[in-house]
């Protein structure tokens, strides 16, 4: 495994890309343990800065990400998880978190109703 | 324009994606002015944390990025620049900065010799 440069409290940014469609689904952060768990289990793990803990994508929603390859950038301070996404990546119900242009035009496809998946208390 | 949440010294992470091949080319940071310049000129601008200034991709190498669309994520704290890349995105000469797997296997394609483009003093 290449040495990684973790920063900002031991975190590394992770770009999540659909391995078939090449769509960018989301961006999140991982710490060293989350990267190791992702490698060893084949299921995407991240670190939540707000909840201050590791989370497995899909643990609440069922929208897991099966990780095929992990890529590293030239500076070794950013990763790509190439994934097979169950359901949708975004907690809003869109397939990708990047469902709008900077001008506010919605271009994404809504896959599920977040109230039904996460309940009314949010994600 | 959607309101953006800049953090870490007024910066927002930018994922750069080839608009045709959907390949993720690099990740960089932008401040508000860099985003505005990108919008108004159609050429990708970023903010260099080490040099503490705005830079236009390609200003030294000639490897400009013509920006088609800019996408925003659900939290409005991450962007995608969809670009048409001249030459290669990575200063190492590879088309994408993500030219290796986490295991250190090179999967990317080298497009240019960095010494010829940037000189021997680095980028």
Curated annotation (Swiss-Prot), chains A, B:
It is found in: Cytoplasm. It catalyses: 1-(5-phospho-beta-D-ribosyl)-5'-AMP + H2O = 1-(5-phospho-beta-D-ribosyl)-5-[(5-phospho-beta-D-ribosylamino)methylideneamino]imidazole-4-carboxamide. It comes from the Archaea. Its cofactor is Mg(2+); Zn(2+). Pathway: Amino-acid biosynthesis; L-histidine biosynthesis; L-histidine from 5-phospho-alpha-D-ribose 1-diphosphate: step 3/9. GO terms for biological process: L-histidine biosynthetic process. Zn(2+) binds at residues 74, 90, 97. InterPro entries: PRA-CH, PRib_AMP_CycHydrolase_dom, PRib_AMP_CycHydrolase_sf. Keywords: Amino-acid biosynthesis, Cytoplasm, Histidine biosynthesis, Hydrolase, Magnesium, Metal-binding, Zinc. Gene3D superfamilies: 4.10.80.70, Phosphoribosyl-AMP cyclohydrolase. Mg(2+) binds at residues 73, 75, 77. Binds 1 Mg(2+) ion per subunit. Binds 1 zinc ion per subunit. Belongs to the PRA-CH family. Catalyzes the hydrolysis of the adenine ring of phosphoribosyl-AMP. This is Phosphoribosyl-AMP cyclohydrolase.
């Amino acid at each position: 495994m290449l040495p990684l440069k973790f920063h900002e409290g031991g975190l590394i940014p992770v770009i999540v890309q659909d391995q078939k469609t090449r769509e960018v689904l989301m961006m999140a952060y991982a710490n060293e343990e989350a990267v190791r768990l992702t490698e060893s289990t084949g299921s995407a793990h991240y670190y939540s800065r707000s909840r201050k803990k590791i989370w497995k994508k899909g643990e609440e929603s069922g929208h897991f990400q099966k990780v095929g390859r992990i890529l590293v950038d030239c500076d070794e301070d950013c990763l790509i998880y190439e994934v097979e996404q169950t359901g949708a990546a975004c907690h809003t119900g869109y397939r990708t978190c990047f469902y709008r242009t900077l001008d506010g035009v919605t271009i994404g496809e809504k896959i599920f109703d977040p109230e039904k998946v996460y309940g009314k208390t949010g994600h």
